């Protein structure tokens, strides 16, 4: 079961061009090194922030829990989320950040907070991932039944594409430049397109954005 409760926009089920789109990022980070729970909450061996869900001092002071971070991130409008929304302006036909995200759902793949020193946010590493994260990903997909899953970046893509037992057309990945494949999940009554652009926080996002939009348009028109 997933720990982070996905953000679900008010118009998610209306979708974009009639297609429901779930966005999957990599990780959330905690920079509060002074917190008494920091070492255990962000421990990359334990990989479990859930014991601190409703007792984290930082979140409790703001009336939220750790599991609310997907919605918290969208509402705070961090630069990565703005960059991604801007990339969808032409497809959505709207240049308003809140409006674009209202048509999407979002969560991150890794199901615990990674540590940060407050100045540098390290990239997600392969050894940060676990089977629990994949199971949580599938549970989110079953719950939200998206038509398209947009997967940010190259850290989690092997788990979601190449190693994903539910992907039905792995042989087409090379022909699709590793941007597009499809999965079929028991309990979901339609095939789901996976579109895998570069991460919006990377410099490659800007140089490859048009290629991403090409494959997203293909998925929208299937």
PLM regions: where:
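Short, solvent-exposed loop/turn segments at secondary-structure junctions
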Residues: 26-31, 110-114, 154-158, 199-203
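C-terminal capping/extension of enzyme domains
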Residues: 122-138, 157-222
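A short, Lys/Arg-enriched amphipathic alpha-helix followed by its capping loop at the start of a domain
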Residues: 87-99
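Surface-exposed cleft-lining segments at the edges of enzyme active sites
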Residues: 60-79, 110-129
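Proline-aspartate-enriched helix->loop->beta-strand connector
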Residues: 137-154
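Active-site and ligand/interface coordination hotspots across diverse enzymes
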Residues: 1-76, 136-140, 179-186, 218-222
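Structural motif
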Residues: 23, 150, 194-196
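Short, contiguous, well-structured surface segments enriched in hydrophobic/aromatic residues
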Residues: 97-114
């Amino acid at each position: 079961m997933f720990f982070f409760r996905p953000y679900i926009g008010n118009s998610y089920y209306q979708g974009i061009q009639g297609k429901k789109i779930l966005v999957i990022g990599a990780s959330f980070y905690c920079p509060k090194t002074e917190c008494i729970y920091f070492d255990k909450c962000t421990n990359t061996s334990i990989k479990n922030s859930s014991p601190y869900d409703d007792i984290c001092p930082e979140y409790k002071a703001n009336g939220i829990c750790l599991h609310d971070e997907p919605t918290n991130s969208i509402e705070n409008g961090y630069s990565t989320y703005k960059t991604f929304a801007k990339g969808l302006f032409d497809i959505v036909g709207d240049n308003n950040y809140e409006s674009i995200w209202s048509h999407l759902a979002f969560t991150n793949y890794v199901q615990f907070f990674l540590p940060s020193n407050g100045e540098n946010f390290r990239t997600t590493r392969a050894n940060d991932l676990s089977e629990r994260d994949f199971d949580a990903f599938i549970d989110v997909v079953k719950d939200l039944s998206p038509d398209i899953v947009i997967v940010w970046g190259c850290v989690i893509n092997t788990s979601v594409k190449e190693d994903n037992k539910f992907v039905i057309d792995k042989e087409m990945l090379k022909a699709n430049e590793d941007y597009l494949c499809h999965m079929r999940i028991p309990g979901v009554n339609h095939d789901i397109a996976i579109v895998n652009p570069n991460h919006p926080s990377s410099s490659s996002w800007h140089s490859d954005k048009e290629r991403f939009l090409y494959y997203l348009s293909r998925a929208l028109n299937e």
